[in-house]
Regions:
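Glycan-recognition surfaces
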Residues: 3-125
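Short amphipathic alpha-helical surface micro-motifs
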Residues: 7-8, 21, 101-102, 147, ...
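Glycine-centered structural positions embedded in regular secondary structure
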Residues: 44, 150, 164-166
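Aromatic- and carboxylate-lined catalytic core of secreted/periplasmic carbohydrate-active enzymes
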Residues: 112-156
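Carbohydrate-binding surface patches
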Residues: 158-188
Length: 188
């Protein structure tokens, strides 16, 4: 109700005032009627979705599509976008061409870069080969601030698992592009 909304806004404002603006709130928009997309997003990041390989509801292109579609309306840099442990629960995706295991770990991370990447997993369960992602993360950190300072817009086709898609970050005279070549006949 409106009173709850007003109380929550007062709480956010008071915390920001007393900390000199040194707090970022993490708003959870995963269920029910919650703030995040169109209200309270000035207070911090938006935790967008709960995906789990346990439930076979994590597909990299679904996550990419959600970010791509929302970035038309909500600042992409405010959205926490998860990538999961692609080595878990592979048997649940047997024969599925869009199974997480069919993508590189670097690709899974890259699908989150226009937003706020979130490693949604128990890192202790990762195999040694997962550590190779460190070089990509370091390179991303070099441009992350500038990339997120621009207006981030979706480009290409809507992610479907078989499209060419991506994001453009525009900031005055400069910008960045991220392209994804999903599984399609023209991928050679």
């Amino acid at each position: 109700d409106k009173r709850s909304e007003s109380n929550l806004r007062r709480l956010f404002d008071r915390v920001l005032e007393r900390t000199g603006g040194q707090v970022v709130f993490n708003l959870d928009a995963t269920a029910g009627r919650r703030g995040g997309y169109h209200m309270f997003n000035e207070y911090g990041n938006i935790f967008l979705e709960n995906r789990y390989t346990d439930w076979q509801n994590y597909y990299p292109y679904w996550t990419l599509r959600n970010l791509w579609m929302l970035s038309k309306y909500v600042p992409a840099e405010k959205l926490q976008i998860e990538f999961l442990n692609k080595w878990r629960n592979t048997e649940k995706y047997a024969g599925d061409p869009f199974a997480p295991a069919n993508y590189s770990f670097e690709y899974l991370f890259a699908t989150t870069m226009a937003g706020q990447p979130l490693a949604w997993m128990e890192a202790s369960g990762l195999p040694e080969e997962a550590l190779g992602i460190g070089a990509l993360i370091e390179r991303y950190k070099e441009v992350q601030h500038d990339f997120h300072r621009g207006v981030i817009l979706p480009v290409g086709d809507e992610p479907s698992g078989r499209s060419w898609t991506g994001f453009q970050s525009v900031d005055g005279e400069r910008g960045y592009l991220i392209f994804f070549r999903e599984q399609n006949p023209d991928r050679k």
